[in-house]
Amino acid sequence: MSCKVKICGLKNREDARTAIEAGADYLGCVFFPPSPRHVEPQNAAEVFDMIGDADVLRVGLFVDPSDDQLMEVLNHVRLDIIQLHGHETPSRVEEVRLNFGLPVMKALPIETAQDVEAARAYDKVADRLLFDAKPPKGATRPGGNAIAFDWNLLTDTSWDSPWMLAGGLNVENVKDAIAQSGCKAVDVSSGVEAEKGVKSPELIEKFIAAVKG
């Protein structure tokens, strides 16, 4: 089975179309105003409308959201997965799953083997796990910082929840990342951008081809 690909931080219909036609398995929109990839719910609905009947999942990324913030988006946007990318506890992850009846993907910052072990508190609690690089000190965003971590930290680890790899992935390194980590899915945002917050259709196509080629 080929590795699945999530293109995150999409802001317009054209980039969504490019990702879908290139073979993306997940499209992600960011609902976090400090991010250069933030979109309003109405814009996200337009992005996801491009999926049509394609076998592509809609992912909404949130950072420590309240139930009201989640509901505000869900009133306008159909999501298949809620991605929590903040400091949400395992109990909060479970609460969101129950309150909204949607699968939850929990992003977990990784830098050391201790971080990998700490992530186990979310295994089987979240429907999916997303291992991302720990943001640098002083960073205003928990992800999308174009930073990688040591993928060997995940080699031969076993998880009950399906997991995805993120953090500094790009066309040049994604094959090595898959080989070293053993991941079955990858998530990219900054690695397919021409500039911060602006996707490159060419890089989207090349990234997906590198993963699935």
Residue locations for each model-derived region?
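Conserved N-terminal beta1-alpha1 strand-loop-helix module at the mouth
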Residues: 1-185, 190-213
